[in-house]
A protein has these predicted regions:
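Structural signature of tandem alpha-helical TPR/SEL1-like repeats
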Residues: 24-33, 59-70, 92-104, 126-138, ...
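Terminal, low-structured helical/coil segments at or just beyond the last alpha-helical repeat
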Residues: 25-28, 190-193, 198-230
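N-terminal leader/linker segments that initiate helical-solenoid repeat arrays
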Residues: 18-62, 66
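Helix-start (N-cap) detector for alpha-helical repeat units in TPR-like alpha-solenoids
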Residues: 45-46, 79-80, 113-114, 147-148, ...
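Position-specific recognition of the canonical hydrophobic site in helix A of tetratricopeptide repeat
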Residues: 56, 83-90, 124, 151, ...
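Canonical tetratricopeptide repeat
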Residues: 50, 84, 118-121, 152, ...
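A conserved position within tetratricopeptide repeats
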Residues: 34-39, 72, 106, 140, ...
Length: 230
């Protein structure tokens, strides 16, 4: 099932890139400073947003969600607060609440890329695969060069047994990010599961020819050779 997980992880990781340059203690120090500043200026939207961002860095999802709620109570049209409250609620597995915020955000900003990915992600987590697929189909039209969208759609298509569609999307993901071994492996694993061993081997060989280290695919190569007696 690893190749199916790549699609789901593609939806998740676009939101999960930590800020560089500070360790946990430095973030805690920043939080202490922000708490003092907020005590002096409790109506500052900027300070509340900055504090919420630090809460996220520290994994304090509930505190972050509370900060975004304070901001939205003052200005329901603040897109940063709306998006990141949806994100924090998804981290807290409050998917219905996250869905509400993503839909509000997309009503305000229909082309918000991360918002649409988040919308698809929570739909999937709620078991609404068709709705998630509808969102990703729309995103392919809106963002035809997004490798993340193709990979995410391929993962859901596999879960739904739509293997030919998934193969197409893994091919597109490879085309857009030809040096990503995970996409190659997902593509080849699906072909292997369909007993299309020669095609799977061709996908792996082409990736190695593109200078992806063969070691990434060692186990799958061995399984293919076992099936084909090579």
């Amino acid at each position: 099932m690893k190749q199916q997980m790549i699609g789901l992880l593609s939806l998740m990781t676009v939101f999960c890139v930590p800020a560089a340059g500070q360790n946990t203690q430095q973030w805690r120090d920043s939080l202490a400073v922000l708490n003092r500043q907020i005590a002096a200026a409790p109506d500052s939207t900027d300070l509340h947003l900055r504090k919420a961002a630090v809460n996220i860095e520290l994994g304090q999802w509930e505190y972050a969600a509370d900060e975004y709620t304070l901001v939205l109570a003052k200005n329901a049209q603040n897109p940063a607060a709306r998006f990141y409250r949806a994100y924090t609620n998804s981290q807290l597995k409050r998917y219905d609440q996250a869905l509400f915020d993503y839909e509000e955000l997309l009503h305000q900003l229909p082309t918000h890329y991360e918002g649409r990915l988040g919308h698809a992600y929570v739909q999937q987590k709620l078991g609404r695969r068709m709705e998630a697929m509808d969102e990703l189909n729309l995103m392919v039209e809106m963002f035809p060069d997004s490798v993340t969208v193709y990979a995410a759609r391929a993962g859901i298509e596999q879960e739904m047994g739509q293997n030919e569609l998934a193969l197409y999307d893994w091919e597109q993901a490879e085309r857009l990010d030809s040096l990503n071994p995970d996409y190659v492996l997902s593509h080849a694993e699906l072909l292997y599961s369909l007993r299309r061993y020669e095609e799977a081997l061709a996908v792996l060989n082409a990736a190695v020819a593109r200078k992806i280290p063969q070691g990434y695919f060692h186990q799958l190569y061995a399984r293919i050779r076992k099936e084909t007696k090579q």
